[in-house]
Amino acid sequence: MSYKTEDVMYAEKETSQHGGTKDAPTSQATSRSTAEYRALDAAHHIHPFSDMGSLNRAGSRVIVKAQGVNLWDSEGNKIIDGMAGLWCVNVGYGRQELADAAFRQMRELPYYNTFFKTTHPPVIELSALLAELTPAQFNHFFYCNSGSEGNDTVLRIVHQYWATQRQPARKFVIARKNAYHGSTIAGGTLGGMAYMHEQMPSKVENIVHIDQPYFFGEAASDQTAEEFALARARQLEAKILELGADNVAAFIGEPFQGAGGVIFPADTYWPEIERICRKYDVLLVADEVIGGFGRTGEWFAHQHFGFEPDLITLAKGLTSGYVPMGAVGLHDRVARALIDNGDFNHGLTYSGHPVAAAVALANLKLLRDERIVERVKVDTGPYFQNKLRETFAGHPIVGEISGAGLVASVQLAEEPLGRKRFANGGDVGTMCRDFCFNGNLIMRASGDRMLLSPPLVVSRPEIDEIVSKAEAAIDATARQVGIR
């Protein structure tokens, strides 16, 4: 057997250390040996969110090729990507249409800014298409390079909005514990992750947090999921009253928590959050960086939960990760306030970058024209969710499956029926993640929750493979902790 593209050819070889087949790469793309790549990487590259000493001693796995939902490393091992990179490769790897869009735009207009009375066709066309795809009241978009920058931009927009409303005292932004809104200083402050805050003595002022709606880990034994979600939502009202309603600018939340564990609140949660925001005239911000562009089977995750935000943060699936780009969508009432009130003094060198905009435009057309989002809603999404629930029903260390569409988490637990978590849950999750990695599946750990978010083009047989590999890793974890 061989796997061949115009760039790389792999010839089948002996069994590899990671299982399956080990293929020998024979192309310029992998001209160095794995050992050489690792040595250079250790010598010069600081990785994100990594213990560099430990990583350099072990050596990074060098990824050299991707196609569809699969990756190949420098040793020729084929890996199925259960996380779409970092939640972003919605249309799958290797789409020639996106490469062609980037190439054409680089030849025509590789860069120009949108600062000083100038614009360009790609960003104009992208904005018009986003206005079609987003809910009816979203017709204006500000561009940046990532979700982190998008949430920084949200803060600038929120404060400018209230300045235009002659209510400058509205400075407080309420977020949630164990939320993730990026890793810039502002994004990290908005996020409620203690381990990030510990390394950030310089935090943004006037950001406060309420508890997350994590039923399995934090509900009382006599609470239903609906009662718990309602109680957690009502913490928002209590916090607004504590701060003074005239001092609160906005509430920000991911429709479902992504990096925090793919936590889906009960149906009582978001309607109550929206009711409270409207009652006190607090802007409601939906961080759609992970949930946007089809992940739940709806174009945007807030549509899955049935609420209407005032601002939405977009990234990841906007370009399927092929090039960096983020955006903030503004509800008409917010956009009109900015448009009618002079300068908005915020921007980035690459705001609305023409190549990124061209790739985003081509990517969104694929999602629309190939009906990828609809397929997630009616076919692969339900199949994925059912497959997970059937596979792990009654498993001795699985407490719950949470998710919708093509995003899910598997809660690891010492006593599933009693919702008793492992005392060393983070270690157990890391162990399970490593079993997945060694079994050539990318499955992420968030503490004791194992996360899956494959490309939206994943097929039913590929879902079967992902779930089978996940089951093998979780079985191995159960044996390792002495439960199976």
List each model region and its residues.
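Conserved N-terminal phosphate-binding loop of PLP-dependent enzymes in the Aspartate aminotransferase
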Residues: Y3-E14, G20-R484
